[in-house]
Structure formats: C-alpha cells, structure tokens
C-alpha cells in the first residue's frame, strides 16, 4: 500500500478513486492531480513506480488535506461562534445554519425529541 499524506491508499483501485481516500481530495481535485503529474487516471496504484508515487505525494502536499484541513474547518467554526454572528449562534445551539425550517424538521441536527414535562 502506498502512503500519501499519512493515509494508506488502496492498491487495487484506479488512481483517481484511490486519491479520494484522502480527506480534502474529491473526484475533481484527484483528476487535476493526475493531469498535473501526467499519470493516467485509470492506472492502478500498484502499477505505479515509486518515482510516480513520490510525484503524487509532492502534488498532494500542495493542497491543504487531512488533519490541517480538519483543523482549519473547526477553527473557522470556532471563529464564527466567538464572533457571535448568526451562523455562530446556530452552531452553538446545534441548529441548521442555512435557513431550513425547524418547527417540524431538523431532527438530525436537533437530536432526539425531548418529552414535554407536566
């Protein structure tokens, strides 16, 4: 198994699909990486030479992925909460952020129903 960005990439899969195992790399970015490195999208990871895998590593290192991306996302959410803006308040209360209705739906975000006390 090749190790790129701290993740074991599956050997049996095509390069484009295998790169999506890295958090922060989707299909579009994986295709862009393959185009930039001149590696065929349909080539399987086990068929690549060590030099090609090193080139892939260098190309992936140009992007913010995995732990750094997760940290950046959580810091952005924390910043919104500290600012006290509307989105920050919605995050703090664990409610939907983007204008969805909450009178009847939003159970996933709000959690299980709480019984009404009498």
Swiss-Prot record:
This protein's GO CC annotations: cytosol; small ribosomal subunit
Keywords: Ribonucleoprotein, Ribosomal protein, RNA-binding, rRNA-binding, tRNA-binding
Pfam families: Ribosomal_S13
Annotated InterPro entries: Rbsml_uS13_C, Ribosomal_uS13, Ribosomal_uS13-like_H2TH, Ribosomal_uS13_bac-type, Ribosomal_uS13_CS
PROSITE patterns reported for this sequence: RIBOSOMAL_S13_1 (PS00646), RIBOSOMAL_S13_2 (PS50159)
One Gene Ontology molecular-function label: rRNA binding
Stretches the record annotates as Disordered: 94-118
Annotated GO biological process: translation
Protein biosynthesis is among the record's keywords: no
Function: Located at the top of the head of the 30S subunit, it contacts several helices of the 16S rRNA. In the 70S ribosome it contacts the 23S rRNA (bridge B1a) and protein L5 of the 50S subunit (bridge B1b), connecting the 2 subunits; these bridges are implicated in subunit movement. Contacts the tRNAs in the A and P-sites.
Quaternary structure annotation from Swiss-Prot or TrEMBL: Part of the 30S ribosomal subunit. Forms a loose heterodimer with protein S19. Forms two bridges to the 50S subunit in the 70S ribosome.
Family classification: Belongs to the universal ribosomal protein uS13 family.
Name of the molecule in the record: Small ribosomal subunit protein uS13
